[in-house]
């Protein structure tokens, strides 16, 4: 009976399998995206599907909700994006683009999956009316203050002119 002395021994194969077993969990962990990475990927998808002329970039990310540990479960997200100066046709990352002055702001909500292999998201974005409403409230308050001030000035002028008119004694 002949033994194989020159071939790989059982000990070497065991060592190789052990190392593979240690490396595989690291590869699986590397495939799970962080909450912010998943949102940035979703924004890339939004930019690809958008018919707008310029790219959008993350302006504000709402706090991460409490989540379970399963990367395959859809996670709720909400964030705000703003139009940049970079055209959609550019090869630049949106993060390398400056925000456009008076650029369009959109509020986005939906879900993302943190498993990088699935790379799935369901996001819808609409014009952020909260900012427009705040601006409208500002102008309404200015109008009220100016209007109230003008009424007071008008009343003082009326009182002053009323005192100038000579009074007749009867």
Swiss-Prot record:
Disulfide bridge partners, by residue number: 86-97, 108-125
Modification after translation (UniProt): Proteolytically cleaved by proteinase PRTN3 into antibacterial peptide LL-37. Proteolytically cleaved by cathepsin CTSG and neutrophil elastase ELANE.
Gene3D superfamilies named in the record: 3.10.450.10
Pfam families: CAP18_C, Cathelicidins
Keyword Transcription: no
Stretches the record annotates as Active core: 150-162
Name of the protein in its database record: Cathelicidin antimicrobial peptide
Record gene name: CAMP
